[in-house]
Swiss-Prot record:
Propeptide: 257-281
Sites where a glycan is attached: 150, 239, 246, 249, 252
Ranges of biased composition (kind: Low complexity): 69-94, 106-158, 167-203, 210-227
Signal peptide bounds: 1-18
Organism, scientific name: Candida albicans (strain SC5314 / ATCC MYA-2876) (Yeast)
Protein's cellular compartments: Cell membrane
Designated name of the protein: Predicted GPI-anchored protein 39
Source species, domain of life: Eukaryota
Chain intervals for the UniProt region annotation (Disordered): 52-94, 106-227
One cellular component term from this protein's GO annotations in UniProt: plasma membrane
Induction: Up-regulated upon milbemycins A3 oxim derivative (A3Ox) treatment.
Keywords, alphabetical: Cell membrane, Glycoprotein, GPI-anchor, Lipoprotein, Membrane, Signal
Residues covalently joined to lipid (GPI-anchor amidated serine): 256
Record membrane topology: Lipid-anchor; GPI-anchor
């Protein structure tokens, strides 16, 4: 009877302990999900609820090769955006094509209590140079020299003697199909990509970006030597934006660890008490 009662109480204590562990695990998961959901809701309210009140957008584009530039700025607040672009000409003695594009966009959303500022700038420059020189020389020299010596006869009354001497000297010199071909080809291309993304709160945003926008190349040949001269000049673009913002801190001090410790301790005490009671019986 005592053995049966002890086994029954031990089974009950084991079931209670397993239920307590599962309950504490579920509470910890719920607490973590609640914290994640609270942060996502707050971020959505900041970006969606207050983002449509104020907006500032600027798009800048320029093309150096065609010599054309266009810019459009739309304003709906007191924000100010100043842009200075300096472009220098590109010269190449053989053939060169240079294209560069600069784009900048700034969006500002603000309210009475919370402000979110996001700035994205990207610059891409592509320079390509291709030079092909070919020289072909063909020299053909042909020389033929020949010397022929034929018959000599000597005769007397008593005895006839005939001597024949044949001598042929042939000198032939042939130079043909002497070809000298020189192919000089040079191709160089460079791609410079600079992109930066930043999020700033209650801090004036000042970004200076320097983009190499012009490249000149000269090629000179003297005798049998070749020389390349590369000259790079930089064009400077300044983009500045100022904004005022307020900041508020939200903290949640209750964590999932507190739930696990609190409920785990309570169920552990209950299990120990059940085991001690079974032993006393």
């Amino acid at each position: 009877m005592k053995a049966t009662t002890f086994t029954l109480l031990l089974s009950i204590a084991t079931a209670i302990n397993a239920a307590a562990f599962e309950d504490s695990r579920l509470k910890a998961l719920f607490a973590r999900d609640a914290e994640i959901s609270f942060g996502a809701t707050l971020s959505a309210e900041i970006s969606h609820g207050f983002g449509h009140h104020h907006g500032h957008t600027a798009d800048l584009s320029s093309e150096i090769g065609g010599g054309s530039s266009s810019s459009s700025v739309s304003e709906s607040t007191v924000e100010e955006l100043s842009t200075t672009t300096t472009t220098e000409s590109v010269s190449a003695s053989v053939s060169a094509s240079v294209s560069a594009s600069v784009s900048a966009s700034v969006s500002v959303s603000s309210s009475a209590e919370e402000t979110s500022t996001e700035a994205t700038e990207s610059a891409e420059t592509t320079d390509s140079f291709e030079t092909t020189d070919s020289a072909e020389t063909t020299d053909i020299v042909e020389t033929t020299d020949s010397v022929d010596t034929n018959t000599t006869d000597i005769s007397t009354t008593d005895e006839t003697t005939e001597e024949t001497t044949d001598a042929t000297d042939s000198v032939e010199t042939t130079f043909e199909s002497v070809s000298n071909t020189e192919d000089l080809s040079s191709s160089s291309s460079s791609i410079i990509t600079d992109s930066s993304e930043s999020t700033i709160e209650e801090t004036p945003l000042i970004t200076d970006t320097s983009v190499p926008s012009s490249l000149s190349e000269e090629y000179s040949t003297s005798g049998s030597s070749s020389e390349w001269i590369h000259t790079t000049t930089a064009a400077t673009s300044h983009n500045s934006s100022n904004s005022n913002s307020n900041h508020s801190n939200v903290s949640n001090t209750t964590t999932s660890a507190n739930f696990a410790i609190q409920y785990g301790t309570d169920y552990g005490v209950a299990v120990v008490a059940a085991i001690v009671g079974a032993l006393l019986i």
